Each structure stands twice: as C-alpha cells, then as structure tokens.
Amino acid sequence: TEPNEKGLEFYDKVFDCCKKHGIEPLVTISHYELPYALVEKYNGWASRELIEFYMNYCKAIFERYKDKVKYWLTFNEINCGTMPMGAILETGTIRGFEGPTDKVPDNKQERFQALHHQFVASAEAVRYAHDHYPQFKMGCMICFITSYALTCDPADEIANQKAMQISNWFCSDMHVRGEYPSYMKRYFAENNITIRQEPEDAAILKAGTVDFYTFSYYMSNCITTHKDADDVGGNIIAGKKNPYLKASDWGWQIDPIGLRYTLNEIYDRYRIPLMVVENGLGAYDKKDADGKIHDSYRIDYLRAHIEQM
C-alpha cells in the first residue's frame, strides 16, 4: 500500500512552518494510534508481522522528511504496555474487545510479547536510521511515574523497587542497554510469561540502542505493603497518598522536587542526553468576568518544575 500523499503533504507544511518560526521538530513515530485494522486482523503487536508494517512506515517518513526532521522517538510512553490499560493504549492487543475500557482483560503473556515486538521494531528503526541517515538522532519516550516507599519498612522499600523496575526502568533498559534485565527474567518466571524470540533478536536489540532519552513527568506516587494507606488519584497509574504533597483537582500529586530526583536517577543510570517532553497541570479551569482563564496556579506549577531542572 502506498502512503497517503495528502497526509505526507500536511506534515511537510507543519515542518516548514516550524522551520519558519525557528522551531526544531521532535517527531514521535507511533503515538497511541495503531490502525484498528491491524488490531482486528493481527491482534495488534501480539503479531510479529507488525514489525514489517512499522518499518515500512518508518522508511517512508524517514525518506520524506530527512531534510526537515532530525530528532525522532520510536514509541510514545512505551512502558504503558507493562500495565493492563496498555493493551488499549500501547500494544493494541484487544481484538474482539468492545469495552468498557476499565474492563479490558489483563493478558500479561500477550502484552509482554507485544512489547518484545515493539522493542525489536524500535531497534530496527534506530539501526536503519543510523545506517541511512547519520544526521538523525533516535530516542525513546517513557511515562515516568516516580514512586517512593511510603514508610521505612523494608517490605515497602522492596515493593517500591519492584514497582520502579517494572513500570519505569524495564522499557528504557531495553531501549538504552539493548537487553533484558535480570529482574524481568525473574518477573517472567514468576508470572508464567514466555517471550518468544527469533535467534537474531538479541543482536538486533543490542545494535539498535537509542541516542537520547525522553520522558513525561506529571506526578509521583507512594508504594506500600500496608493496607491502611489512603489511595490517591492518577491516570492509568494510581498509588498511595504522600502526606507531604498537595494534589491537583484530578488527584495527581504535585511534586517538583521529584522531577529533580528523577533526572538524577535517569542520568546516573544511562549517561545519555535527557529531555522532558511532557509536563503540565490539569485543573477545573473557569473563565473570569473578562471571559479569560487566569490560571496563575498553572504558571506556579510550571515554574516550580522548571526551577528543578
């Protein structure tokens, strides 16, 4: 199938406009928009065949925009695939599912197999870009939800360590280090998950590591083994209430210092360039008498986070 020329022309105009105004584009290749036809026919990324479809897409846009785009991200918030809701958001492993979204069945074997195919696809795209377009810089994108142990109970510390490993570190370890970490091998064994791999996959993953790391940061959570802790709101990730933090109207805990902590942790782990690509505040915005929204609270939120950078 040939790419949609009108769609390609649209992004030509977007990138030309960016250049006109001195804006450097950063393109996410796949951002929660897997074509539903691929869900219906292949059960999304559960099928290895999607790697070829993804590469055809990458080759088309790389060649088309090679003189307009330098920075690329292979998948948006790929680590959401480690969570049950990731079957809808990230992996598309929902063939036959009609909703509601909070009732999506949790098939860990399917989700983590789909993630493996995405890791291989990402590595293939990075390797292809490096070989054919040496001016390109290829990155990953992680939904980073920093968490703390709620108490100094060692059981809480271990629970938080495991949560951070699965939710935050696993996918970026794959992208940056190019191999499965030991903690995931244990997780797979404990959850009866068997990742089917082709003989060449290990070499592909190792050869296709990213040049830079990007992430979204909105909030932090607390993790505990204690049953009496208060829950706190979130998006697809919920945790326990941190008594030292305020929360947004939506229950997301506001933690600017957590961003500083997160930047330190990520850079010490990987030693590659970092970029915060999502950050902001959701609120019940109301128009004042002049018909405008005077959201000084949002300015305060952004200022506090920028100061930590």
Question: Model regions: which residues?
Answer:
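Active-site region of glycoside hydrolase catalytic domains
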Residues: 9-308
